[in-house]
Each structure stands twice: as C-alpha cells, then as structure tokens.
C-alpha cells in the first residue's frame, strides 16, 4: 500500500484552498499548481511575466528542496498561461532554472488564474 505524506515548505506560499502544497508517495512528489505569490505576503510578485515566472520557479524549487530533491528532479511540468504570446519568455526563464535532460512539459492557455496571476505551474518530481 502506498502511503502519502504532505510536503510543506515555509519558503513557498501556503495553499490558498483545501489542498496540499505537495503530496509525496514512495517514489514521487506531486506538486500543486504554484502561482507567483510571494511566500511571506501572499501578494502577486509583480505584473510582468518575467517576474511572475521567476517567482513560480522559486516557489516550485522551495517545495522540491523540502521534499529532498530539486527542480532537476522534476519529470513533468504542466504550465497554465493566460497569454500564449508569453511562450518564448516562459521558455527562456524556465531554461535558466533547469538542466538537460529537460522534463516533459505541457502548456495550456487558460482564460484566468487565481489572484489574477498570468501563469501557474504544477509538477511531478521523482524521488
């Protein structure tokens, strides 16, 4: 039987609803979607996509580290964006946080995200 445990990092925003920052099983960590919130103020990091994607990646990294890994342990990202025109910017900034081989990734344009964020990313990390 797979036992699951909650992963909580104080260096990433606390959940803004009835869900965990992340759930770990014996071999994987499932990280809930992270929006660009400052972990201390729970305010949006800024209006620019560069600032927002950087904050999201920092939040994801904090959760990965708390779970015993890093962003390079991620095997799959799902990216939700409100403006597909920001695709190249997202690629450029994500590349700064990752090493090859890059994880698998899906990217979906959405109408809106919580707290008027322009980007949200969830992840699956291998332990």
Which ranges hold each PLM region?
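Short, polar/acidic, helix-capping and beta-turn segments at strand->helix junctions
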Residues: 2-127
